[in-house]
Curated annotation (Swiss-Prot):
An example Gene Ontology molecular-function term: L-methionine:thioredoxin-disulfide S-oxidoreductase activity
One of the protein's GO biological processes: protein modification process
Organism the protein comes from: Streptomyces avermitilis (strain ATCC 31267 / DSM 46492 / JCM 5070 / NBRC 14893 / NCIMB 12804 / NRRL 8165 / MA-4680)
Gene3D superfamilies (UniProt xref): Peptide methionine sulphoxide reductase MsrA (3.30.1060.10)
Domain of life: Bacteria
Annotated keywords: Oxidoreductase
Keyword Oxidoreductase in record: yes
SUPFAM superfamilies according to UniProt: Peptide methionine sulfoxide reductase
Gene that this sequence comes from: msrA
Protein name, per record: Peptide methionine sulfoxide reductase MsrA
PANTHER family from the UniProt entry: PEPTIDE METHIONINE SULFOXIDE REDUCTASE, PEPTIDE METHIONINE SULFOXIDE REDUCTASE MSRA 2
Catalytic residues in the record: C14
Amino acid sequence: MAAQTQRAVLAGGCFWGMEDLIRRLPGVTATRVGYTGGDVPNATYRNHGTHAEAIEILFDPARTDFRAILEFFFQIHDPSTKNRQGNDIGLSYRSAIYYVDDEQKRIAEDTIADVDASGLWPGKVVTEVEPVGPFWEAEPEHQDYLERYPDGYTCHFPRPGWRLPARAEG
């Protein structure tokens, strides 16, 4: 019997670039962008209060896992800048992991510790780790944005030399 699809919710700056790169990962079966982690019900682009721009990811655990997705997440955005990615500044652009269960929380905390220990970023990770709450899907014009506008704005890029070292087992 095949494993069920699992869900991850991440925020790391403008959701266009995050979605464009993460949706291409092997094992990712669906993505959608939206708003979460804030105070406004039925959030929209024009009124999202303290929500972060985020991406909801569905993935096949037989083909990838939460840790692999997080390692890529930490490669494509700068988790050491608070409320900022590139030219995008503000609470909407914070780095956050919204965990769906205790296992995701543990993996998130372990991965952050490994990123900090690696020295791959100039500062300590400021990524928030919070339980997932309501996810308000963004308007249709924001879904798959860079697929429709390949030369559109992004501040997310794969860093080929960025590889998180394997965790030393103690």
